[in-house]
A protein has these predicted regions:
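Compact, glycine/acidic-enriched structural inserts
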Residues: 167-221
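Compositionally biased low-complexity segments, especially N-terminal hydrophobic helices
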Residues: 13-23
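Short, solvent-exposed coil/turn linker segments
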Residues: 113-116, 190, 273
């Protein structure tokens, strides 16, 4: 019965695709697929352009040497944007003795992640084998997200880069509060914009407290960003361009980007709304016993069958979306299914580093002990 339902969905999808090919009708339903005019298909293997095309252009090189840059790529397997290195230079000027703590007093932010490498902290690590895929990787952080700043410990607020592919520069800087939800909120296309956005929000909350220090820091941030040609917009032109390529928002809200060709091959929507899927996942996670849980898994198992059909027809985005939604739900009951779906999606999309990050994270997914440089 389940196979017949899957076959029916496959046939319906084929018919829809033929109709779209002929008439280019507007999509309806859960994750509105963009028409070709606004959604550019990816390059050859589905990877995005390697550099962002937005307001932040022709940024001069920072003082960070090539040796440190090479070490960063070796440890993270990711290329860092130039604004990260400029922000390090900026914080060294603010607080030469402790650049990573330069924003602690005024904003309560601590520089971590790649900044730990720039500070040489990894050379004195208490952990003999730190895994930088897991360094400050919070419970809901998808492989696309890389933490660079820590905020409130209470809410596990953190700020990081979000990449659509491992070999592209970040699409934006976002924030998440892991104790509250999986939601990732966009803050700008570079770390200066993100910190300014956070500063302006803090100033409203704090009132007159530290007003002078915040004002001084704001002026310095604006001056440096302007000198470097970095945009301080919270939503740049480049980010708006990316929004047009997002095929679906997913539970974390930041959206996923997959290449979709002129025949609409690359992504097909899930047969459930977000609310419907969450209801299914809730029934599984909160089942009173194993028998109830196995029964509740039925609708999800059916969707996995649909994903297999989608992968056969090169609609890799469907498995990517379902796997990401399961990951964002946060329950360990879905780890086995996530391992079925997401590494396969990343492999088909040629985003293998994200698959490596995911595997490492699922093996050690926690709210605690996130500093890979401390003793484990």
């Amino acid at each position: 019965m389940r196979f017949n339902a899957a076959q029916l969905l496959l046939n319906r999808t084929r018919r829809r695709r033929r109709r779209r090919r002929n008439k280019r009708k507007k999509m309806t339903g859960r994750a509105k697929r963009k028409p070709k005019s606004s959604q550019d298909s990816g390059t050859g293997n589905g990877e995005l352009k390697k550099a962002r095309t937005d307001e932040s252009k022709a940024v001069p090189l920072s003082e960070v040497d090539s040796e440190q840059r090479d070490e960063m790529v070796r440890l993270y397997k990711l290329q860092m944007p130039e604004d990260l290195y400029h922000f390090w230079d900026f914080c060294k000027e603010l607080c030469p003795d402790s650049p990573r703590g330069a924003l602690k007093d005024t904003l309560g932010l601590q520089l971590v992640g790649p900044f730990d490498i720039l500070a040489g902290a990894h050379k004195n690590s208490k952990n003999p084998q730190p895994n930088f895929h897991l360094h400050w990787r919070y419970l809901y952080d998808p492989p696309e997200f890389q933490t660079i700043l820590l905020g409130s410990e209470e809410t596990q607020h953190h700020i990081g880069y979000f990449r659509d592919t491992p070999d592209s520069l970040p699409a934006f800087v976002g924030e998440n509060e892991a104790k509250k939800s999986c939601t990732i909120t966009q803050m700008g296309d570079n770390v200066f914009a993100a910190v300014l956005s956070y500063l302006l929000k803090r100033r409203k909350e704090k009132g007159s407290k530290k007003a002078e220090a915040l004002e001084s820091l704001e002026a310095k941030l604006r001056d440096r960003a302007e000198a470097l040609g970095l945009s301080l917009e919270q939503k740049t032109k480049g980010m708006k361009q990316r929004d047009k390529k997002v095929v679906t928002k997913t539970f974390h809200g930041a959206g996923i980007v997959v290449p979709v060709d002129k025949n609409d091959v690359g992504y097909r929507e899930l047969p459930e709304t977000d609310a419907g899927l969450k209801k299914i996942l809730k029934a599984i996670a909160e089942a009173r016993n194993d028998e109830e849980r196995v029964k509740a898994f039925g609708p999800l198992q059916e969707m996995i069958t649909f994903v297999q059909f989608a992968n056969d027809e090169c609609d890799y985005g469907m498995g990517y979306e379902l796997g990401m939604d399961l990951f964002c739900y946060g329950s360990h009951y879905f780890h086995k299914v996530i391992r079925q779906l997401l590494p396969m999606a990343y492999s088909l999309l040629k985003r293998n580093v994200f698959g490596e990050i995911l595997e490492a994270h699922l093996s050690s997914r926690s709210h605690d002990n996130l500093d890979q440089l401390s003793a484990h």
